[in-house]
């Protein structure tokens, strides 16, 4: 079966593993998934990420992060731009998520960035997802 939206699959796997409090998950790798995983790690939403290379694209191993009492660090993930309805934002219109408590992941000409980085570099692009 052909996957029509690998980014939505990536976010759904993280959301599902987070809901049942798994420590880690493995999923097929791609360049954009690696960039999104690095953003989630840099912003403190996941503990760590590893890349396992093989003959194909490889595998990404994501280590989820929980608070001291077991509360989830990621409370929500939402795919915004979808294959059937792409959502773009100008550099002046890049959205803020929950007044800055969450992040928007934006695919720009300078790579995949958070909303804060896109505003700082004054670039717009495709709004991939919200994470809070």
From Swiss-Prot:
Keywords: Ribonucleoprotein, Ribosomal protein, RNA-binding, rRNA-binding. Signal peptide: none annotated. It holds the Pfam family Ribosomal_S8. Gene3D superfamilies: 3.30.1370.30, 3.30.1490.10. One of its GO terms (biological process) is translation. GO terms for cellular component: ribonucleoprotein complex; ribosome. PROSITE patterns: RIBOSOMAL_S8. It comes from the Bacteria. One of its GO terms (molecular function) is structural constituent of ribosome. HAMAP family: Ribosomal_uS8_B (MF_01302_B). One of the primary rRNA binding proteins, it binds directly to 16S rRNA central domain where it helps coordinate assembly of the platform of the 30S subunit. Part of the 30S ribosomal subunit. Contacts proteins S5 and S12. Belongs to the universal ribosomal protein uS8 family. This is Small ribosomal subunit protein uS8.
